[in-house]
Regions:
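Polyanion-binding interface signature
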Residues: 1-137
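Mid-to-C-terminal oligomerization/interaction "stalk" domains of large proteins
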Residues: 123-169
């Protein structure tokens, strides 16, 4: 199916990028295992599953890690989240942790605490809500992916956005 095709292609494209930057793919936490199960059920879910791939960038303190993430909701997003090691879940941390993130990664745009999960994110493929892929209510972009050339172009545009977002933590 198209979701699997997109995810496999994105993972193939970003794996070398994360290795090059020293990010570590998460597969140790029960969160990851739960997410993988959610990914398999994405289309059948009545609600958004918010699944995806997570890569550890760095520890912020003993309780929190900064993760790079490709997230699948109704659309695709790439960005940074904090992971609470003790609670085994993604969440925005306390003010001191947010200040530590800002200090350690000054390229993260100001006003970076977007919502309860994200530190910063951009929509894929081009951080434009009007051109975002929609896996829940199939839009024109979704249907265009069945054309091989348009699929390649989509993956390349996603890769460019992902690279730009990853470079914030260089």
């Amino acid at each position: 199916d198209m979701l699997d095709k997109v995810l496999v292609a994105l993972e193939d494209e970003i794996d070398p990028l994360v290795v090059e930057r020293g990010f570590v793919k998460d597969s140790d936490h029960s969160y990851y295992k739960k997410e993988y199960e959610q990914l398999k059920k994405f289309y059948d879910a009545d609600k958004n599953s918010c699944s995806g791939f997570s890569y550890k960038i760095d520890s912020i303190n003993q309780d929190f890690e900064l993760w790079f993430r490709i997230d699948i909701d109704k659309d695709l997003a790439a960005g940074f989240c904090t992971f609470n090691v003790k609670e085994n879940k993604l969440l925005i941390s306390d003010v001191n942790t947010q200040l530590a993130i800002r200090s350690k990664f000054p390229k993260i745009p100001s006003g970076f605490c977007i919502n309860d999960t994200w530190v910063y994110y951009e929509l894929l493929p081009e951080n434009d809500d009007s051109r975002a892929l929609n896996f829940k209510r199939y839009n024109d972009l979704y249907y265009s992916l069945y054309d091989d050339e348009k699929f390649k172009e989509f993956i390349n545009n996603c890769k460019a956005t992902i690279t730009r977002v990853m470079d914030i933590c260089k």
